[in-house]
Structure formats: structure tokens, C-alpha cells
Amino acid sequence: MPKRGKKYLEALKLVDRSKAYPIAEAIELVKKTNIAKFDATVEVAFRLGVDPKKADQQIRGAVVLPHGTGKVARVLVFAKGEKAKEAEAAGADYVGDAEYINKIQQGWFDFDVVVATPDMMGEVGKLGRILGPKGLMPNPKTGTVTFDVAKAVQEIKAGKVEYRVDKAGNIHVPIGKVSFDNEKLAENFAAVYEAILKAKPAAAKGTYVKNVTITSTMGPGIKVDPSTVAVAQ
């Protein structure tokens, strides 16, 4: 285990590690235990009772945070003709086809999200080995393979975030910055939690949400009592 600094250990003393906090208290603690000198990201981690090795227990999707993430994503859209014009009008940072495929193959990654029209996926598929490991491959489940490129770009710019269960059954999602109002962080948290609940696979057995933790970029994890979060079940 890596050696922790003095500031981290001081912050850790503020947290009762045996307790699951109401969301309002947890957010307050995240701010108190933030030791970064920059506007740190606040992230939520869910430990789920699923077996990601089974195809029917994979979880992947996206949710629009009501107050965004505090960062405006750079969007690359693979599209042609009218769809390319729609993407540009919606605010996409980069729009094109073959030239961007070539740039990526040469190591260019000045973007955060990739959107593609379905007719472009034959070409974009060539980038699978490059974009896949980085979590950047367009996917219908996250709304990034679509003919409605304008809507996709607008949602991403407004604060749409993707989530995907990892091999250990965890999902990590950013919900804003420590500078956000507590209420905005709570509402972003609730939006993500509701999306995770709705994404529960029918094949999942036993307790679905086993543990919920929020943390700032360099701060300690704080357990959340999800029963204190108002969501539409």
C-alpha cells in the first residue's frame, strides 16, 4: 500500500470509516477532507453485486448530470454530409471522417468523447484496438452511435457522463468539483444513483448496490448511506 502524506492522514481522522453517512453529510466531509490545491473532482464509486464476466450482467450506459461535471468535454464526431453540418452546428469540437481516423492512428487524442453515425462505424471500427482500451469507442448503449448527432453533442456538452462496470464489479463516475454547491453535488449524485438502479441486470442476484463511496481527487473515501438519497425507484 502506498505511503500516505501527512495531510491525507489528517483528513482521514475526520472520517468514521465504520459509518455510512447521509448524502448531505458525506458531501460536507468530501469538502473538508479535500487536500488538493486545485479544484478537485468529486467521484462516486459503486460496488455492485454483479458478475461482469457474464454477458447478461454487464452494465454500461450514460446519464446527463443536471449540473454538469465542471468540465466541458471535447467532442469528436465521425459523420459526413448533412450529419457533419448538424454536429458542427451543435458545437462539436472536431467533425470529419478519414482524416481523423488517420490522426488517431498516428497518436492524436485531443478529445474526450467520440460520437459516430451508424454508417461510419465500419470505418471507425478500425480504431477499436486504439479507442477500446481507453474507453473511447462509440457505443449505442451510451448514445454515442446515433444519427441524432446534434442531440448527442448537446448532451455531452451539457454534462453527460458514461459509466461502465469494471472486472471487479465497480463503477466510478465523476459528479462535479469540490467548488460546486452542496445541493448541486447531491442532485448530480442522485441522477447517477438513479441511473445505476435502473441499469440493474435482470440476472443479478442478491444485494445489488453493496457499497457506495464518494471521494475527492486526492482525499479519502467516504461511505454513503444510499437510503438517504431521494430517487425515483
From Swiss-Prot:
Record key words, sorted: Repressor, Ribonucleoprotein, Ribosomal protein, RNA-binding, rRNA-binding, Translation regulation, tRNA-binding
Listed GO biological process terms: regulation of translation; translation
UniProt GO cellular component terms: large ribosomal subunit
Ranges in coiled-coil conformation: none
MF GO annotations: rRNA binding; structural constituent of ribosome; tRNA binding
Keyword tRNA-binding attributed: yes
Superkingdom of the source species: Bacteria
Secretion signal span: none
InterPro entries cross-referenced by the UniProt entry: Ribosom_uL1_bac-type (IPR005878), Ribosomal_uL1 (IPR002143), Ribosomal_uL1-like (IPR023674), Ribosomal_uL1/biogenesis (IPR028364), Ribosomal_uL1_3-a/b-sand (IPR016095), Ribosomal_uL1_CS (IPR023673)
Family the entry assigns: Belongs to the universal ribosomal protein uL1 family.
Role of this protein: Binds directly to 23S rRNA. The L1 stalk is quite mobile in the ribosome, and is involved in E site tRNA release.
PANTHER family: 54S RIBOSOMAL PROTEIN L1, MITOCHONDRIAL (PTHR36427), LARGE RIBOSOMAL SUBUNIT PROTEIN UL1M (PTHR36427:SF3)
Subunit and partners: Part of the 50S ribosomal subunit.
Name recorded for this polypeptide: Large ribosomal subunit protein uL1
